[in-house]
Amino acid sequence: MKLGMVGLPNVGKSTLFNAITKAGAESANYPFCTIEPNVGVVSVPDKRLDVLEKMYNTKKKVYTAIEFYDIAGLVKGASKGEGLGNKFLSHIREVEAIVHVVRCFDDGNVVHVEGSVDPIRDIETINLELIFSDLEVLERRMEKSVKLARSGDKTAKYEYEIMGRIKEQLEAGKPVRTLEVTEEENVFIKSLFLITSKQVLYSCNISAFSSSSSPDNSSSILALTTITSEFSSAA
């Protein structure tokens, strides 16, 4: 499985990536320290596999592996190319799921691209850029399909209708993953490689000098819980 770490610059993506993978990727206090994705592979221990190894006395044991991709920070306007946005967005399309890292700590020594720490604003910024990018991709696909759909091709018509529903969802500011679809429709949606159709895990980066229950951290986490529920899967 491939997981991509996304977020604004300087939110702690590379730090989290290094903590998980022990890869030693560069982490610095300035935007766009990362340009090309850093890649790390982590094995997932499974006690069931250990039992089977003993039962059958196998010579080789291979755990499931997860590939983590530390993707460069996105900024407002990324869908229009700001901050090398188009290049970074293409990297996100290649992963299977997303880890969205959100900065919830206030530290004047760590630069914030927006000049202040506001987790909810930052989440909305990233989500909107991903939605705008998906809209652009979807509209190009619809332009190619419309003639075939109007000619009476049943498959093209079926797919065009699904894309129409997806477009309405995106134009309403909602990610594709929150759209209720059938299993058959989901197979087609996956073929579109839309970023907002991927499942997301939100990672809250709190201050290293206080606990998650401190007033500042707990209020940020509560606010994040509320807004991220709006962007969760329809299921």
Task: Give, region by region, the residue ranges found by the protein language model.
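Conserved G1/Walker A P-loop phosphate-binding module
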Residues: 1-82, 86-107
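Conserved Switch II/interswitch segment of TRAFAC-class P-loop GTPases
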Residues: 40-43, 72-79, 93-132, 136, ...
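Residue-level detector of transmembrane insertion/anchoring sites
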Residues: 60, 195, 211, 215-218
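Active-site-proximal flexible loops/turns
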Residues: 25, 77, 129, 141, ...
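Helical mechanochemical/support elements of P-loop NTPase systems and associated helical scaffolds
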Residues: 31, 35, 48, 61-67, ...
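Alpha-helix boundary/capping motif
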Residues: 213, 218, 222, 226-229
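C-terminal-of-GTPase-core extension/linker across diverse P-loop GTPases
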Residues: 2-6, 17, 142-211, 223, ...
